[in-house]
Design a protein with these regions (language model features):
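Bacterial N-terminal signal peptides
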Residues: 2-15
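Exported/periplasmic ABC-transporter solute-binding proteins
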Residues: 19-64, 71-74, 78-84, 92-95, ...
Length: 261
């Protein structure tokens, strides 16, 4: 009888945990990976909100009920930590910029800068400050300036900030916004995360992915924090993301490891 009572008690506790919800605010580039992480996390149901990290940070700072924040940079979660809204920030994943090119663009690692500077070519980026991907693109422009003076002004002036803003277009279900914008020829080349470029090419195998040359390369460190006052399951979700299982899921989606666990 005691064994049966213990089993029933355990089942009740498991059901209670399953009914708990944890609100995760995360960078849009993490959607596929963290949806899979959430499905593997058994201690609570994860209610995920995805978007540009800078815009999510603003919403959290204004009091929205996020419990875990996974950002595409370290600065946004650190600003919440500094303001007393969140706990310590942990580096949990890394990404980098790639160039995603329309099928008819003759672009490679050697001529990438020349092609981006071509006045006839449309260069797409995300929105700086609102979305770290845009900040990383501007960092690439600064590196281009050191290689070829005048490049920063030319690139920053011509760059089309097509995603990552409050009014940016959204892709329909089953499509990526980058694949959609290239198909509509809103851009000829798009500077985006390598993970996002891989997802877009799954949608259209004719799209080209160009590695950014070393002199222009920009890496992205992703930061994770738990918001003050969150449920205990929120910290356990963060630990699960940092665990071997969570890191393996992120790696499957093209991310490289953050802090070792």
């Amino acid at each position: 009888m005691r064994a049966l009572a213990g089993l029933i008690c355990g089942l009740v506790l498991m059901q209670a945990h399953a009914q708990e919800q944890v609100r995760l605010y995360a960078a849009g580039s993490l959607r596929a990976a963290l949806d899979e992480v959430a499905a593997a996390f058994t201690e609570a149901k994860v209610q995920a909100v995805y978007g540009a990290s800078g815009l999510l940070r603003e919403r959290i700072a204004k009091g929205e009920a996020a419990e875990v924040f996974a950002s595409a940079n370290m600065d946004h979660p650190r600003s919440l930590e500094k303001a007393g809204r969140a706990g310590p920030v942990r580096l949990f994943a890394r990404n980098r910029l790639c160039a995603l090119a329309a099928p008819d663009m003759r672009v490679n690692e050697e001529n990438l800068l020349d092609r981006m500077l071509d006045p006839a070519l449309k260069l797409g980026t995300s929105t700086p400050k609102a979305d770290p991907s845009g900040d990383y693109a501007w960092e690439l422009f600064e590196k281009a300036e050191r290689l070829r003076p005048g490049s920063f002004q030319r690139l920053s002036q011509k760059a089309l900030q097509l995603v990552g803003g409050p009014d940016s277009p959204q892709a329909p279900p089953g499509r990526t916004v980058y694949g959609m914008l290239l198909a509509e020829r809103k851009a000829d080349i798009f500077l985006t995360y390598c993970t996002a470029a891989l997802q877009a090419r799954q949608e259209n195998a004719a799209l080209g992915i160009v590695e950014v040359p070393t002199a222009l390369a920009v890496g992205a460190d992703y930061g994770l924090t738990v918001i003050k006052g969150a449920k205990p399951q929120a910290e356990r979700l963060a630990q699960f993301i940092l665990s071997r299982e969570g890191q393996d899921i992120l790696a499957k989606h093209g991310f490289t490891p953050g802090e070792p666990q």
